[in-house]
Amino acid sequence: MAHTEILDTLQQGSKLSKPEMKRCMDAIMDGAIPDTAIATILTLLQKNGISADEIAGARESLIERATPITLDERAVDTCGTGGDSAGTFNISTAAALIANAAGVSIAKHGNRSVTSQCGSADVLEALGLPIELHPEATTALYRQTGFAFLYAPLYHPAMKKVAPVRKSLGIRTIFNILGPLLNPARVKRQLVGVFEPSLMELYAEALRQSGCSHALIVHGETESGLPLDEASVSGRTHIIELQNNVTCRHTTKPTDFHLQQWPIADLAGGTREENALLITRLLEGKATQAQREAALFAAAIACYVSGNANCIDEGICMAKEALAERRALRNLEAIIEISRDLERKYGTGKN
């Protein structure tokens, strides 16, 4: 399908099928479509409303081009789309560390900040973790600790090709949606936070098509109803659960899990150094109750998605124990020490 045909289809307001979208993305990544046409395609996809098939097709193309890394089917990713402008600290990163200490295998795919002061890569780097480990080093780290951080630019070098077009457009495109779906370890278990409720069904279907075995797609609200791309302890959380190809929907509030409701201002983040200190204090047992419960809630969902907990309530108990016994702090210290040793042995992925 030539790019002129793709443009004709999109200009008519029609959707691309999954195979058509895959061929389109293949052509973009192969340099077979000029930048001006790429810009038009991305704009029209956004204008028409991106479909689950289009997301699934684009994902398939990009995953095939990712630098491969093999972990195992137990691995869980905790990530969000970003874009909520709420300015919270790195809740999903803190949750990943707590869940890992509670026995959950974590393969966290992340990047530097786009809409906030501090992304997952920023805060982990500030905590002392080498974020650009060679894939062999990351695999070894995962085998020893059950934790891996997969730095997106390292595993998706082909994405550089569209960076200038995306920057010149200055709008959200399908690439902003694809991030949480592009874990190079091809994880089968995910907690995905989305900033816009209309994206929930799209993610659920795209994850189903990718072979995901268990995922929770969550959209939170602040106390005033503003959007959050994570499970909320400030208001309601809307959830779509995907398990064994079946989806169900429900809405929760913090008190359903014996958590308090906190103002979103109590979860404010800052610079990478400030957020790293906040997470350290959280793992030391010195954070505020609001910060603690926000991280516990997300960690509990990760425990549930992993299969280690039978429900979110049980996950909260597991996460609380990991914090109370300082296991999460000791675990982070071990991850940092081992990863530095492995960096010396294998070098970085840029080598």
Curated annotation (Swiss-Prot):
Cofactor note: Binds 2 magnesium ions per monomer.
Domain of life: Bacteria
Catalytic activity from the UniProt record: N-(5-phospho-beta-D-ribosyl)anthranilate + diphosphate = 5-phospho-alpha-D-ribose 1-diphosphate + anthranilate
Annotated binding of anthranilate 2, by residue: 166
Entry similarity comment: Belongs to the anthranilate phosphoribosyltransferase family.
One GO process term, biological-process aspect: L-tryptophan biosynthetic process
Protein name: Anthranilate phosphoribosyltransferase
Organism: Chlorobium phaeovibrioides (strain DSM 265 / 1930)
Alphabetical keyword list: Amino-acid biosynthesis, Aromatic amino acid biosynthesis, Glycosyltransferase, Magnesium, Metal-binding, Transferase, Tryptophan biosynthesis
Pathway per the UniProt entry: Amino-acid biosynthesis; L-tryptophan biosynthesis; L-tryptophan from chorismate: step 2/5
Enzyme Commission number(s): 2.4.2.18
GO function term, MF aspect, one: magnesium ion binding
List of residues binding Mg(2+) 2: 229-230
Cofactor or coenzyme needed: Mg(2+)
Binding residue positions for Mg(2+) 1: 92, 230
Subunit architecture: Homodimer.
Functional summary from the UniProt entry: Catalyzes the transfer of the phosphoribosyl group of 5-phosphorylribose-1-pyrophosphate (PRPP) to anthranilate to yield N-(5'-phosphoribosyl)-anthranilate (PRA).
Main enzyme class: transferase
Binding of 5-phospho-alpha-D-ribose 1-diphosphate, residues: 80, 83-84, 88, 90-93, 108-116, 120
GO CC aspect terms: cytosol
HAMAP family reported in the protein's UniProt record: TrpD (MF_00211)
Pfam families: Glycos_trans_3N (PF02885), Glycos_transf_3 (PF00591)
